[in-house]
Amino acid sequence: MTFTRISHFSLFFSSFFFLSSTLSSHLYPASATTPEKDGKTRSLYSEILRDEAVARLNDLGKVSDADGYLERTFMSPASVRAGFLIREWMEDAGLRTWVDSMGNLHGRVEGMNASAQALLIGSHLDTVVDAGMFDGSLGIISAISALKVLKSIGKLGELKRPVEVIAFSDEEGVRFQSTFLGSAAVAGILPVTALKISDKSGVTVQDALKGNSIEITEDSLLGLKYDPASIWGYFELHIEQGPVLEWVGFPLAVVKGIAGQTRMKVTVRGSQGHAGTVPMSMRRDPMAAAAELIVLLESLCKHPRDFLSSGGNCNEQTLESLSTSLVCTVGEISTWPSASNVIPGQVTFTVDLRAIDDVGREAVVYELSNQMYKICDRRSVSCIIERKVGRFPKHFAKHFA
């Protein structure tokens, strides 16, 4: 479901109600009164889970490093201001708060059994450039609001396990071109070399944290890893960021997994020349070649069966999965020297390719690369394809579904 207007109260409210009900049904001891039966709680639903939550999402949507659109990157001034706001709201909900050495903001309530496995709920507070206000923020605010309802009716201390809300410092990877810095640190899969990654200004991840009075070392980074045995599960409420649920009229859906992702950088080099003097028959134009490569990508991703055979690694199940889940995007393209009267000497563009089937995704990358090289050879231009990011798909726990 894509929320295009804040006035979509019925759909919006159902998301918060779902999370509140999830907390109630899964975490209260059997002898406790569930909040749904409490008249006071029902009135609080509209006050806290709708009105206040909407106001907070609007407030958070105004915290930006840019004028006229929403942008918050890792450890930017707006990101820090957003963290202050969220921390204030966490404490208002009765949570104990702290910031870890990767800049993640945590809010926790221990409940009746502090040694029990904890339920983690959260999302990310950073954004892409020109972001929507609900991406990431919805998952954080909904969790805080649901817990505030429990506090308001005196039930927060009756949770049978700890509940921890996490506002991750980085998911999008806009500033350092390295995604999931915040959650990867908590999961224990972020390499210590990530601290030395630099942004376009030469500032490293470690420098950015230090600039905000957060000291991090290789040892403290490794110490951020949560013991899997201490975690009961992780839950995140998130907007769909697509048109499907809204199109079919469903307010909510349970996600079964996250697609694997491959990001590539493609560099095409040809022969730079004057736009008015080089005959078409003598051109080695990397822009024209790049255009053909991009159209190839679109065709392959729309019709994978036309490019991949059912033999080898791609069985019928894989092809069927690709037909429904494969998506491909060219989001950035640049030319050199980038002048209207100059045939470019070089064109660079990115490829973002995602699919839930890992074998199928690799088959697509392999076939795409082969076809791209053939096109470049035919056009007498050189082509370099670099794999920048690779993420395996994640299939979610069935008992949550």
Regions found by a protein language model. Name each.
Residues F16-P35:
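N-terminal signal peptide
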Residues P29-S76, A194:
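N-terminal capping segment at the start of a domain
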Residues A30-T41, K265, G276, D285-A401:
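Metal-dependent amide/peptide-bond hydrolase catalytic core
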Residues K62-E110:
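A non-catalytic alpha/beta surface segment that caps or lines the substrate-entry region
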Residues A93, L105-L138, A143:
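Catalytic-core environment of secreted peptidases
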Residues I121, D130-E171, T262-V268, V278-L300, ...:
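Alpha-helical metal-binding/catalytic segments enriched in His/Glu/Asp
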Residues K151-V174, R305-N313, S321-C328:
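Short helix-loop-beta-strand segments that form the rim/entrance of peptidase-like active sites
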Residues S169-S281:
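Histidine/acidic-residue-rich, glycine-tolerant segments that coordinate divalent metal ions
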